[in-house]
Amino acid sequence: MTIWVNQKEHLYDAPLTLVDLVKQLGKAKKTGIAIAVNNSVVPKNNWGNLMLNDQDKVTIITATQGG
């Protein structure tokens, strides 16, 4: 199935949860991450329950520090 992550196409085998996607992208241990699926923010405690579907659009935002 095709999942769009930050406007880039990625191909995955189904089924795939949001937490599976985060792990495959190497972001599982990072903090300060917010994720929206199809323009709806998903609370972190729901990442393991949300099944992704073909053509879903995932936006991952990572907080950064600076000055």
What function would you assign to each model-found segment?
Residues 1-66:
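Ubiquitin-like/PB1-type beta-grasp interaction modules and other compact soluble beta-rich domains
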